[in-house]
Curated annotation (Swiss-Prot):
InterPro entries: Enolase, Enolase-like_C_sf, Enolase-like_N, Enolase_C, Enolase_CS, Enolase_N. It comes from the Bacteria. This is Enolase. GO terms for biological process: glycolytic process. The gene is eno. Binds a second Mg(2+) ion via substrate during catalysis.
Length: 428
């Protein structure tokens, strides 16, 4: 038995300089697991609740001392003596202890830090790398990275409404090569932006945030960079968008400031997205509609769902109850998986499994406020998810995940598998 003998929570900083929760879990054998949780900028209204102190005299009210105290008192008392290898039982203990639907009493940030740290400790105890511990011998598939090279929306101070413009190396023969392709396009893009006299400063997720005239201009910059780096857009490197449409939905209309204040109905906005998909090699669109606009989602899915991956992030918030409703109604064809949206590893894996059974893809994702913790890299391989979103090719909080995936690919050796375009099995 891998008995838990000590738990220590602490307040540390994330990549934006805001406090977040870190947890150490010590086992009887002397083995320790450590994990730190991320935090989002644009969040879904039905996400599990991240507990913040609200004390304006510390960190502008964003301190997490209450969440840390919950780890060091209540949670510690409840889990000391439990077997760290019983992840499901441990997570259920945390959920029952919290007693709310949205983890608002203890805080999803406190619960997730413990859940992740326990898994790390148990993996260490078993002598297995985390991805193998989580997924077993069948965990051999590396994820296709969706690399956020231009930022807009809530992640940048420019005129772009859409939050992320991504490159997807679908034609790469391996994960290592996919990362190289992405890095080379990133550097080509930096040169193009610089040569146009625009800022090459990067946003929260490591992508550039140039002030361009409209969204198509941003797409065209990326296409130029792909070509300049020596690759073929579409065949080798596809494009993805994260609209984060809940952020520009006002009074039932989609208001695009970056398109001159254009106000569009869901049907008109779908038409615009469809026209971009016809013109450019876009194979994935995330949060194309407001999280509450299920009629809009239905229009979008019926129009584009056969040949474009439509990812629900704010829509599904990694929640099986909401995902099941979406599957039943034929809404979207993919779910974004953010561990802190739901608050435990067990519930995260349940959402991935439900998506796969329904023929939906599951895209493992970072948050805009990250740490050096690379657990999501191991989750991506451990669950054979096939896709990961973990930012651009800069900032060590993003690179930490790419580097961990490079190590995993090396560890797997000849049995490592990079799916490329096959990761988009929801498209026909």
């Amino acid at each position: 038995m891998s008995a838990i003998v000590d738990i220590v929570g602490r307040e540390v900083l994330d990549s934006r300089g805001n406090p977040t929760v870190e947890c150490d879990v010590l086992l009887e054998s002397g083995v320790m697991g450590r994990a730190a949780v991320p935090s989002g900028a644009s969040t879904g209204s039905r996400e599990a609740i991240e507990l913040r102190d609200g004390d304006k005299s510390r960190y502008l009210g964003k301190g997490v001392l209450k969440a840390v105290e919950h780890i060091n008192t209540e949670i510690s008392e409840a889990v000391l003596g439990l077997d760290a290898s019983e992840q499901g039982f441990l997570d259920k203990t945390l959920i029952d202890l919290d007693g709310t639907d949205n983890k608002s009493r203890l805080g999803a940030n406190a619960m997730l830090a413990v859940s992740m740290a326990v898994a790390r400790a148990a993996a260490e105890e078993s002598g297995l790398p985390l991805y193998r511990y989580l997924g077993g011998m069948g965990s051999v598939q590396l994820p296709v990275p969706m690399m956020n090279v231009i930022n807009g929306g809530a992640h940048a101070n420019n005129s772009l409404d859409l939050q992320e413009f991504m490159i997807i190396p679908v034609g790469a023969p391996s994960f290592r090569e996919a990362v190289r392709w992405g890095a080379e396009v990133f550097h080509a893009l930096k040169k193009i932006i610089h040569d146009k006299g625009m800022s090459t400063a990067v946003g929260d997720e490591g992508g550039f945030a140039p002030s361009v005239e409209n969204h198509e201009a941003a797409i065209q910059l990326i296409l130029q960079a792909i070509e300049a780096a020596g690759y073929t857009a579409g065949e080798q490197i596809a494009l993805g968008l994260d609209c984060a449409a809940s952020e520009f939905y006002k009074d039932g209309m989609y208001v695009l400031e970056g398109e001159g204040g254009l106000q569009l109905t869901a049907q008109q906005w779908t038409d615009m997205l469809a026209s971009w998909c016809d013109k450019y090699p876009i194979i994935s669109i995330e949060d194309g509609m407001h999280e509450g606009d299920w009629d809009g989602w239905k229009i979008l899915t019926e129009r584009l769902g056969h040949n474009v991956q439509l990812v629900g992030d704010d829509l599904f918030v990694t929640n099986t109850k909401i995902l099941k409703e979406g599957i039943d109604k034929g809404i979207a064809n993919s779910i974004l998986i953010k561990i802190n949206q739901i608050g435990t590893l067990t519930e995260t894996f349940a959402a991935i499994e439900m998506a796969k059974r329904a023929g939906y893809t599951a895209v493992i994702s970072h948050r805009s406020g990250e740490t050096e913790d690379s657990t999501i890299a191991d989750i991506a391989v451990g669950t054979n998810a096939g896709q990961i979103k973990t930012g651009s090719l800069s900032r060590s909080d993003r690179i930490a995940k790419y580097n961990q995936l490079l190590r995993i690919e090396e560890d797997l050796g000849d049995i490592a598998f990079y799916p490329g375009r096959a990761a988009f099995y929801n498209l026909r």
